[in-house]
Amino acid sequence: MSSSRRRKSFTSSSSSSSPSFHSPPPTSRLRPRSPPSSNTKTSPTSTTPLATNILLSLIAFRLVNAFTVRTFFQPDEFFQSLEPAWQIAFGENQGAWITWEWRHQLRSSIHPLLFAAVYSAADVVAQLLRLSLASRADLLVAAPKTAQAVIAGLGDFYTWKLARYVYGARSYEAWATLALTVVSPWQWFCSTRTLSNCLETTITIVALYLWPWSWSFETPVRKKATRAASRERAQRGPEGSDSLQRLRQCLSLAAVACILRPTNILIWMGLASVAWFRTSWDRRAILVREVLLCGCAVLGLSCVVDRLFYGSWTFPPLRFLYFNIAQSLAVFYGRNDWHYYVSQGFPLLLTTALPFALVGLYRALAQVRTFGLGHLQSLVQAQLALICVIMPFVLSLVSHKEVRFIYPLLPSLHILSAPPLVDYFLPAVIRSSRSYTPRRLTLIFLLLVNIVIALYTTIYHASGPSNILSYLRQQHELHAPAAQTPSNLRPSVKDPSPHGITAGFLMPCHSTPWRSHLIYPTIHAWALTCEPPVDQTAAQKATYIDEADQFYANPARFLREHMAGGLRHISRKPSYLSAQPRPQHPSTTSTNDASHEWPDYLIFFAQLEPTLQSLLRASSYAECYRTFNTAWHDDWRRKGDIVAWCLDPAEQQAWRSATRQRDLENRERQFDRIIESFRKEASGKRDGKLSPFRRWFSSSSSVAPSSSLSLSWPTSWRWPWGQRKRTAWLGVQIPQWTRTRPSWTAWGGDWFGGWRQKKKTKKLLERDLWS
């Protein structure tokens, strides 16, 4: 059959069939798809035992992932989600740090409301189980991680389901997509964090799975077809209720994603544009109608929720765009090169999958010109590739860039990476030929690299912030027993009674979590801020310096001017040991105070330690805790360990004793290693086994006492190879009589041999003693 006949038959068959939202998934080119049973009606949303097992396994996997993450990534993980959620769940006076974005109504309250419900449920569980306050604190720390792990597992699951729809239920590409998601270092590092971008990513991939991809598959209505003809087709067979329900779910989720992150609209504008230009008029009408209905419903619900949260009517997405674009406040937090997303964003997201993603993007974009003749698989790949190009391109026009801004594209990139990955590694996996050994070794190497990156970034790098807050929480439980009674579960930070410990953070702003990890409202703490110049002129913005920059520009001046009492009047005792506790200011929610009280615990990075040792040498502060943070850091202010100084002499002495004990243990372990090496060396020598290096010196230890012992160099040094006697020196022949070795020590051989024998015997005794 010629290509023209195939095209004609395809067009006629597609136009005669009734429109549907989802055509059957295409056949995989590696494994054919088995047809569904004729007596069973399969639904795209139906779940099978396999799908259920995959979902539960992914959720369990992400739970392990969530509780493995011990490192700090971005402040928004806490200050844009958990801190406002803490205030919603427990009240305004519970010590949550509400940043400037919330005071200026730039964020939607939908995301914090999710975790507020999680906090409330965890608190109820703690009360029902009558947990101790320490156990309750651990539960409140773990609850958001558990919720986010479930969200991340759903994102992985729907990534796999969309790949099954594109490539076929039994295709290798679908399983390769799942494998890419599971072994992705970025997914392990970021997916279980409470960032709004993580929730946005999950919502986006679920909505993409529900999107009517078949709309762009069928040819559009010809020009001679009128709108009346389209209405007649719509009257013959209306869309199925199940397909319409899927469309509404898709558009509702897309609207929620756009409310959370307004930049998510770039994804849906691209997909809607393709569907609009490639579908019929009746479907265009349906699309417009459902977009208006679902969009208005979600928007109205969001406005009501924000009205209850903020206390006034507001529209956060519009204010977000106004502050970040019109006032250019995002630039205050850094500028990036125009090629950031290409040179850094995609490599960070994909890591070892980057080459396969580039090949997949190229293949998909090369098929754009064949929209009308291709398969549904090609069309879906092309549209996914388009949004993976359009979104970074538009976001590159903004000066401030972060890799998490394009995080919602990662599932689509994994789907596009699957075919090149299968093409390259599948023969090496299913075949036993030795010619594929390099590919097998490459696969093992890539997996090991992913594992190393994932574990290093989630356990080792930047692990100090969570450790230091756990230490402060433990110190509060130890030194503030009066604040740990059941009647004081929710005291106010503005109420100095009961009184807990105090802490001050001399760090760059938002370097640690806050109330979500401190938990106890009676822990009074303050930290340096970096709020942007809101509602200021261009000249004022040019000279504006935030509090953290003021401190690092001149630490001595800052401490003299911004600390109560300056550098001369510093407390000698911690507040929990004083007869009259120092007054506490509610600086946990705002650090714009003119001065800060000297705290019981002073927290800072090790980079600042020499400066503070010089400034506070006359004070009672001394080290009482130190935890590892990073081996390297791009910010010079955050280099080194995190150090805690305290005023309590008992804590200082306990830390010195513990440090001394650790040093002694390290020395003992080192000494044990030395003794073990001596023991192995001695046992090897008794067995007649010498190291190659010691064989060179074996002649000196095997010399028997003799009256004719020669002390010339060759008798005490024996090379592994033969030694040639020199017969000429500088071209002059050496006489024969000078080549002999006279025993010039023969006169003292008996005495010298006896001395050597005694020395050798002594060495043997010492060796037996060590062994």
From Swiss-Prot:
Keywords: Endoplasmic reticulum, Glycosyltransferase, GPI-anchor biosynthesis, Membrane, Transferase, Transmembrane, Transmembrane helix. Belongs to the glycosyltransferase 22 family. PIGB subfamily. The chain crosses the membrane at residues 49-69, 251-271, 285-305, 341-361, 378-398, 410-430, 441-461. PANTHER family: GLYCOSYLTRANSFERASE, GPI MANNOSYLTRANSFERASE 3. Mannosyltransferase involved in glycosylphosphatidylinositol-anchor biosynthesis. Transfers the third mannose to Man2-GlcN-acyl-PI during GPI precursor assembly. Its main location: endoplasmic reticulum. It is a multi-pass membrane protein. Residues 10-21, 36-47 have a biased composition (Low complexity). It comes from the Eukaryota. The lineage of its organism: Eukaryota, Fungi, Dikarya, Ascomycota, Pezizomycotina. Residues 1-47, 575-594 are annotated as: Disordered. InterPro entries: GPI_mannosylTrfase. It is found in: Endoplasmic reticulum membrane. The gene is gpi10. Pfam families: Glyco_transf_22 (PF03901). GO terms for cellular component: endoplasmic reticulum membrane. Pathway: Glycolipid biosynthesis; glycosylphosphatidylinositol-anchor biosynthesis. It is an enzyme of class 2 (transferase). Its EC number is 2.4.1.-. This is GPI mannosyltransferase 3. GO terms for molecular function: alpha-1,2-mannosyltransferase activity; glutathione binding.
